[in-house]
């Protein structure tokens, strides 16, 4: 007997879209068959008529249970929302797996932990999430500053343990010098991992910050002048050149400028394994919105830029230059988010893990800009492939985890704070009119959200070991 059968829906599979029924047993998809052809009995049967049946969303970029910089928060001791709250919001938004951070990024650890091994630090971070997540989760490991040689030598062990991606910054206090980057890239590339890179030119950012302060133009609405287009252009291309030299795959987090997208396109045209991520607020807002009342609530670092950049990012998502959509989830309350009002003190991030799927669907699928298959690629499958979860995650296929979202393309819904599920008191998407919305979320065969009602438990989520396929690291596979 099957544990669960889903019938009547329009299913997006790796081989295309069709009218299929799905059989689930022991947390796995065991049958994907033509409509009405599954004759096995099931404990639970779900009628998905009129719905898309999609792989569960994968959020590749979150900052959960992270200490907020005192410069941003205006006071010490502030944390972003807990794993329980963030994963609850994720589940309601059709997301079944998210990737957070362990290691040297500011706020993910208490004090300097660089004398401890990568595995010890991973275990400590995992203990914060285990038993407290409605959905599955994994970690990128952040390498910050002048990374000790002994830490670089531990990268191979971390990859073997299931941590396949390593985050670095080229600016801010976590900046890694390029000599150390060279060694890190070689170690990650030789171990079969992939780099996740926040790329800006640190000299340019610092120069522009000082210039804007000197000229009295350091208001938060000028963030795009400090974290600017040419900085992204130069930094992306330097990282790509280093990755080419070391034969290392690159995943650029939060591409913000058209120049960043052009750099990624140039690399991919050379068949380099370079991938880019788009945040859904970057696909919608421009820096002009910073000037509105409470306008910096939309901000995520580096900076939201010009209308031409927003349009360029949209086109890059449509044409496949950018492979994934993400949130850079960083949920606080409104007083924290708006505490700082200068280019150095505006708080980054927002509570977007629940809104990503319906916003992206509304902007791109309901308008005919991309197909439903492309939507699945950018919200689930590509992240699974690039970051080492495919085909366990990101696919409705025999043998895959039964992570599934039922998405109603005919549901017209206005996003309101009252109907969101994060621990926060604001949403930058308040009033956004959605054409299509996730209604039911299934994690490894268990219904955790049923027609908008939470059914799961914060003990449902598991840590996920990952391994990037060699094909992803050889050429741009997706």
Predicted region positions:
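C-terminal cap of metal-dependent C-N hydrolases
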Residues: 338-343, 398-464
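Histidine-rich, glycine-flanked metal-binding segment
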Residues: 1-56, 70-74
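Active-site mouth loops of central-metabolism enzymes
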Residues: 60-81, 138-151, 170, 225-226
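His/Asp/Glu-enriched, well-ordered alpha-helical/loop segment
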Residues: 217-249, 318-319, 323-324, 330-411
